[in-house]
Structure formats: C-alpha cells, structure tokens
C-alpha cells in the first residue's frame, strides 16, 4: 500500500512492513466449486489475482529489496497506470523497470516457482486468522484489521498518513472488540466490486 511506503520513507523508524500474499478470488469463489478446489491449481480459471501474486513471489526469489521494489511498481502499474497485470508482458516490463534478473524471473514465471509459497501463505492466513480480504493489517500481534481506502487529496498529507496509522494501530492492538466500521459510501464500492466479478460467478 502506497501510504505505508510513504510512512517508511518519512522516518517512521519503528515501522517494519512484511507483505504476505492472499488470493482474494480463492476466498470469493471456492464455495462455487467442488470441495478442495484451489485457484492456483486451476489453470483454466481466468484469474486476476494469481498472475501478479506469482510474479511478486518470483521477484521475492531475488531478495527482499527486489520484491519490495517490484511490488510497489506492480501496484502503481495497476492503480495509477491502469495496466493489465495479468498480462505476462506487463509483468515482465515491471520486472525490467525494477531492475530484476530478467532471465531468472522469466524462468520462475514459466515454472510457476512461487505457487507453493502463495498457496501456503493464503491457507495460513485463513486457518490461523480468518482473513477474508485485502488489505488486512496486523500490528504487533494485535487483531487483524481489514481496510478499504479511497484515493484522494488526503494522500498528499503526511499528517493524514500518520493519523491513519495511529487509528488503525489502536483498533488492532487496543480495541479488538470493534468488529466492523462502515460508511454509507462503502455500499457503492461493494456494488461496483460485485459487478466486476459477476461474469465469474454465473
């Protein structure tokens, strides 16, 4: 998430961010398939999640710094440039921009070298923590907090970044009894999301 990266760069010395993969489509669509269905094993399912998650894990195979750079550029490719990050050519372009070893990256993509790690992390998130969506944040062993953020002018304010971090950390560490907070606008976001995935749910 961009705001976490901004916080790290702004001098939050105690902030360490560890990213772990979670396959949202597995959480959303597993109940519509046969028991034991795993999206990362179903090569015929038109997944929007698996290709970029596997690519990010292939970047991680080249070290943490490579992963962090690739992950940030991948996020920007999707949310700022609105590129199709299921396309292997786009994923390769991002790897090139991140300065990765392209030969190794391409081979890892071809052999799906990161699929086992993605599967293990996803199933661990569900089994241990009941994760259902992304992004979900943990702070110092506190309760998991699922967050939806709207892009806007607030992202230009370092104070807003700090305020958001403080509030989410408080909910995670000190207020685990808060189970859900919603604004009316979130219903519209849910409706748009449902329309996006409707073709896969029929």
Set out the residue ranges of the language-model regions.
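C-terminal cap of thioredoxin/glutaredoxin-like
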Residues: 4-9, 81, 85-202
């Amino acid at each position: 998430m961009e705001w976490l990266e901004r916080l790290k760069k702004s001098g939050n010395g105690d902030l360490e961010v560890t990213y772990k993969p979670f396959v949202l489509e597995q959480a959303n669509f597993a109940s519509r398939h046969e028991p034991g269905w795993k999206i990362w094993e179903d090569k015929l399912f038109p997944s929007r999640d698996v290709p970029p998650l596997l690519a990010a894990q292939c970047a991680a195979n080249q070290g943490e710094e490579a992963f962090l750079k690739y992950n940030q550029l991948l996020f920007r490719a999707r949310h700022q440039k609105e590129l199709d990050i299921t396309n292997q050519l786009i994923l390769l372009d991002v790897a090139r921009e991140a300065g990765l070893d392209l030969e190794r990256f391409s081979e890892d993509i071809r052999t799906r070298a990161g699929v086992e790690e993605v599967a293990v992390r996803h199933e661990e998130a569900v089994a241990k923590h009941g994760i259902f969506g992304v992004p979900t944040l943990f702070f110092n062993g506190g309760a998991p907090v699922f967050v939806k953020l709207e892009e806007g002018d607030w992202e230009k304010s370092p104070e807003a970044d700090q305020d958001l971090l403080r509030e989410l950390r408080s909910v995670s560490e000190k207020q685990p009894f808060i189970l859900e907070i919603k604004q009316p606008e979130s219903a519209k976001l849910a409706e748009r999301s449902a329309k996006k995935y409707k073709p896969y749910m029929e």
